Amino acid sequence: MDPQGALVQVSPACERLSGYSQDEFLADPKLMERIVHPDDRPRFEQHIAHSHAAGRLLEGEIDFRIIARDGGEHWIAHTCAAMIDPSGSYLGRAACNMDVSRYKLAEEALLRLNRELVATRDCASATLRATDEQKLLRDTCRIVCNAAGYLMAWVGIVERDECKTVRPVAWSGVEDGYLSSANITWADSERGRGPTGTAARTGETVVLDDYASDPEGQPWRARAFQRGYRSSIAIPLRGPAGDAYAVLTIYADRAHAFARSTTRLLEELAEDLSLGIESLRAGSKLDSA
C-alpha cells in the first residue's frame, strides 16, 4: 500500500485463496474490505484506519475471516509493517495475509472438546449429589447448554401409550415453545423418524447433521431454523434390560456439530445420567418398601 492506503502490488496467490485476481484487487480499492466477513469487518476497518493514522509507527497483526468468490469461508492471519527507505522516508505499508483456516478449525474443535469434558465432569458431579430425579434431569440439561455451549437440550420420557409419545420432562436453553409444538413420537411414522423418535425406537444414538438438507428433519425444519437449531443428536437413556426409557436430545447452532469424539463424550454423559436415575429409583423403592 502507498502512504495514502491505495494498493500498488498484490501477490498472484490472492486468487487461489479468494477467487479474485490481482487486477480485480488493484482496480477496486474496497474489494478487500467487502470480502471480509461481516462479523469481522468492524475490527478490520479499525485496524486499517489505525495503520494509516500511525503510519511508520505501527506494526500490526489481526485475524479475520474472508468470504471467497465461491462462498467459502477462510481464516486469515494478517500482519503489516511500515516500509522505510534508506533516507528515512515513509513509502507505505507491506502486508502479508496467510490462510490459517486449518489451524483455526483445529483450535475451535479443541475448545469445543474441552467444553464438553467440563460438561461431562459437571454432570457426573450433579449425578453423584442428586436426591431428586426431576432436578437431576433439569440440571443435566442446564449444564449441557451452559458448560458445553449447546443451544438447547431436553429429556423426553418414552411413553408406552397407544400414540408412542415422547413426553418432554426437562429442558434448558433456547426452547421458545418448540417442544409443545414438536409432536414427537417413537412410532415408525414421519414424526417418529427424526433423531429423538428413532433413538427411542432403536435404542441407538442418532445424529441429524443438517436441518437444512437432511430429510429426517423436514417436519421440524421451519421451527428449528426460527430458534437457530442447525443440527442435533439424540441419545437414549437405557434401562438394565437395554431398552430406552428416555432420550436426551441436544441442539447445536451449526451444522455437523457432532463429530465422533463429541458423540462419544455425550454418550458417556448420558450413560452416567441413566445410572444416576436408576440409583435414585432404586433408593426410592427401598424407602417405600
What positions do the PLM features span?
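PAS-associated C-terminal cap
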Residues: 39, 85-89, 95-115, 119, ...
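PAS/PAS-like sensory domain cap-loop motif
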Residues: 4, 14-26, 177-180
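GAF sensory/regulatory domain recognition
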Residues: 8, 74, 142-145, 154-187, ...
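Sensory-domain boundary capping and coupling elements
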Residues: 78-80, 95-97, 196, 237-252, ...
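A short, aliphatic-rich beta-strand micro-motif
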Residues: 192, 230-239
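Regulatory sensory and allosteric helical modules in signal-transduction proteins
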Residues: 42-46, 166-169, 176-215, 219
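Short loop/turn elements at sensory-signaling interfaces that couple input to output
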Residues: 2-4, 77-95, 162, 241-244, ...
